[in-house]
Amino acid sequence: MVTHEWKEFEFLTSDLTKRFKLEHYSYKMIKGIDFYNLVLNFSQAFEHVTFKYENVKQIQIENDIAFVETEVGRYTGEYVFNSKNLFNPEINTQNSLLQQFEGWVIRTKKPSFNTEIGALMDFRLHQERGATFMYVLPTTAREALVEYTLFSEKVLDKEQYKVALENYIKDNLKIEAYEIIPKGYLF
């Protein structure tokens, strides 16, 4: 299921480049769909696991019991694990930053990447919108995941992610000719 792994990374700022090895560890890439299918297939083997495909309207907790209200009915349990942004989060002092991503897998015309070294955090970007960095995870000499990450109070327009990625690829990676393979917007 692991499609690639790295044991060495760079951390970059405008005045620092630090390369470090993970020693006994490695950073592994797993495609989301592969993980999803593995867990789904594994879970279906258990009699006490039921999958429901319904639109969730609300999630609440009352007296240590979790309630999930859907368009079809209401479900209860001790725990509810929610990995989706079902509702617009309220920005307040306890929840003041949103983590946002947009990542492109790019393919270059000529070898442009060292597959042994990833850039885990490249802070050589403007920081006016919040804590902003890129990471670059090369999987071949001609392909890499380039991902823009931002912690801020407001969600950017999709065009702003596009411009940031294009500028980074051109200005920082020094790549002029590339194609975007699959494209993903995550929030």
Each predicted region: which residue ranges?
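Alpha-helical metal-binding/catalytic segments enriched in His/Glu/Asp
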Residues: 39
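N-terminal FAD cofactor-binding segment of flavoenzymes
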Residues: 1-15
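Predominantly flavin-linked oxidoreductase catalytic cores and closely associated redox partners
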Residues: 42-176
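N-terminal accessory interaction module
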Residues: 23-24
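Short acidic-glycine loop/turn motifs at beta-strand connectors
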Residues: 12-16, 139-142
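Short, mixed charged/polar active-site loops
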Residues: 17-19, 74
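Flavin (FAD/FMN) cofactor-binding core of flavoprotein oxidoreductases
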Residues: 174-187
